Amino acid sequence: MKYDLICAYCDNRGIGYENNIPWKLSDDLKHFKSITTLNNNGKKNIVIMGRNTWESIPTQYRPLNDRYNFVLSSKVDFVDSHKTDFIGTSFEIMINYINSKQDLFCDSKIFIIGGEMLYNYVLTNHLNNIDKLYITEIYSSVECDRFFPKIDNEIFKIKEVSKFKKENDMFFRYFVYEKRINNNTDDNTDNTDNTDNYINEEELNYKNMIKDILENGLVRDDRTGVGTISVFAPYSMKYNLEDTFPLCTLKRGFLRAVFEELMLYIRGQTDNNILKEKNIHIWDGNTTREFLDKRGLKHLPEGDMGETYGFNMRHYGGTYINCKSEYGKNGFDQLEYVINEIKNNPHSRRILINLWNPKTTCNAALPSCLHQYQFYVNTEKKTLSVQIYLRSSDVFLANNWNVCTGALFVYLLCNLEDIELTPGNITMVCGDAHIYKNHIELAKIMVERESYPYPKLVVMNKKNKIEDFVYEDIKLIGYKTHPNDLKGEMAV
């Protein structure tokens, strides 16, 4: 006999507080009813619950209509003033009763609907009999005193996931989990339909690019001395930004660092010490005294990025002195131009930022890898999209980082006053796509991992000036990821 569990829980897997559901989500209630009443055979399904769960249901809704209501209570003298279909003192008694009434229940689905003790008991003692988990993830920190057990990803895998929904200032989405084949339980039944499993198609494209480089990459020397395997101009990759944010799930991403680096560029800054003060060290290796001297930049102070990303974004063609100097209106402000075009000339095909200046790359500690953004305003859908070009992409360490940089740029622009747009998509185009030799084994491990659904990014405050955004203005919701255990050293 098989049965399903259905549950809604918040950030800490909390499911209830003082015998009540601590949120009001009408969409989730409709979802619960739809799942637990659906039966293609025209029969009523069975919902099994503990006594506390039964009593938490408002009296006007008891019993749950169009379903057989089975209530589990250890109190033999439990008397219910409302009609239940069966009261049992143990879960096994209920299952035996159902088995004894196959003429009545043979086509009924069985749903375990709570609470905490029953969920734990079934997952511990009847794991072999569980078919699916229907989970509503609510992305909110709510005080709870009852909790759902942690889902073991070695036993269960995601079968389906919905888009994000929002109600009463809470974001949530629906998951369906199924048991894996060859899991550690004694059940050898194949419950899964491998032709219809959840796939993160966008991250699959990223994995396929890595596989292409591993299988077909040309071995090349490079400036760092580490060496790479490389392909040129792999297929472009597109990520939809309307519902999710493309932060890598194969290893944990560092969104705060992506944000602070982008804001450094947006503010026209080139001083790595600003990042170091925020405990972000991605530029340390490329701004040491030794590295700058090797680049012929002995006149720049240690920590100076030189005439690259930030300077070229806000002062293109200007005269660069060092990271401590104030530049005012020196050079051309590409970001100011782009914002003005988005607001006042949205059909323009010239809404570009180019961070590559051939004349001055010799003055950069590291010439821009992500060096071009082209923005596109869809005036019908009211969306903003971007295409980014990477002349060079460290695919294991930096490719997803750069994708997230471009995506985050779109989100910030959409949340400026007087720009009434929402994020559309981002397309990544790449020149030299490579994996450093010291990352090859890590990349092989990463591409074998299963992807999770992407999270959602929410910008909570509008700003008059893009320079005024701070990290506390953004929130990442529903980020599931593998641990950050694949730590590759950056080649310098």
Model features per residue range: what roles?
Residues 1-182:
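Enzymes that bind and transform nitrogen-containing heteroaromatic metabolites
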Residues 16, 25, 47, 141, ...:
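Short linear sequence motifs
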Residues 184-186, 196-492:
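Terminal, non-catalytic protein-protein interaction segments that mediate quaternary/complex assembly
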Residues 1-2, 103, 181-201:
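Eukaryotic N-terminal low-complexity, Ser/Thr- and Lys/Arg-rich leader segments
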